[in-house]
């Protein structure tokens, strides 16, 4: 997108895009939000969190944004407590205490589904959960990432937003995406993993009136 090979992208959440902009200086702008997701805790060895025992291993993604989200979900599940100032991207260093004497193992997100038999439980990214057929009903804990930093979004090059013709096209794309048809796909195809988020906010408004 930043190199001009494509006009829009629609895959990252706010935290990821903000991190990329900070790291690489991309001149990109958020033009719409897409959905919130559920990032869940799965296990092939236990049926409830209460069955966790000393020394059990919980795998989480090893990248900063998804790993941080996983830790917040483990806190919501009552497994551990994070430091009060850990915000939206905590690391394992931000773990203040454990309510269960478990070990956290950081793995590449794409390897976690296949590693599930080798650990006690694991937080699985939504895309891999869908690809591997993990159902929401089978989760030990359903993690709700319905907070704006975790919403996925559509982004454009900032320079293109000064072109009224491109803004008009982008507006049509956003309206087509934020539709009842998309909601139906979320419900019928993705098993409840995706939910519309932020559709009531028109992020293109400042550019349509420029």
Report residues per predicted region.
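Short helices/loops that flank or line small-molecule/ion binding pockets
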Residues: 1-7, 72-73, 93-123, 127-128
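A C-terminal functional module that forms or caps the active site or interfaces directly
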Residues: 126-163
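Short amphipathic alpha-helical coupling segments at ligand-binding clamshell hinges
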Residues: 54-56, 165-176
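A bilobed periplasmic-binding-protein/Venus flytrap-type ligand-binding module shared by bacterial periplasmic
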Residues: 38-49, 151-169
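A conserved helix-loop-strand patch within extracytoplasmic ligand-binding domains
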Residues: 31-80
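Short, glycine-/small- and polar/acidic-enriched structural segments
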Residues: 2-47
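Periplasmic-binding protein-like
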Residues: 66-75, 175-198
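Ligand-binding "clamshell"
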Residues: 19-31, 44-46, 118, 123, ...
């Amino acid at each position: 997108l930043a190199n001009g090979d494509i006009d829009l992208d629609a895959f990252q959440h706010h935290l990821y895009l903000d991190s990329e902009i900070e790291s690489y200086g991309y001149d990109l702008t958020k033009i719409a939000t897409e959905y919130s997701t559920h990032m869940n805790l799965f296990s092939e060895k236990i049926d409830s969190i209460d069955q966790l025992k000393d020394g059990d291993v919980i795998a989480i993604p090893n990248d900063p944004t998804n790993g941080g989200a996983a830790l917040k979900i483990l806190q919501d599940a009552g497994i551990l407590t994070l430091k009060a100032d850990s915000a939206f991207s905590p690391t394992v260093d931000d773990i203040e205490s454990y309510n269960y004497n478990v070990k956290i193992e950081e793995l590449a997100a794409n390897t976690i589904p296949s590693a599930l038999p080798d650990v006690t439980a694991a937080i699985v990214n939504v895309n891999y959960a869908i690809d591997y057929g993990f159902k929401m009903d089978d989760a030990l804990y359903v993690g709700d990432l319905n907070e704006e930093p975790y919403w996925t979004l559509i982004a454009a090059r900032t320079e293109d937003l000064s072109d009224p013709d491109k803004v008009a096209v982008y507006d049509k794309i956003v309206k087509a995406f934020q539709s009842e048809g998309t909601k139906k796909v979320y419900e019928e195809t993705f098993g409840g993993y995706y939910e519309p988020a932020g559709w009531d906010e028109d992020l293109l408004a400042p550019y349509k009136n420029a």
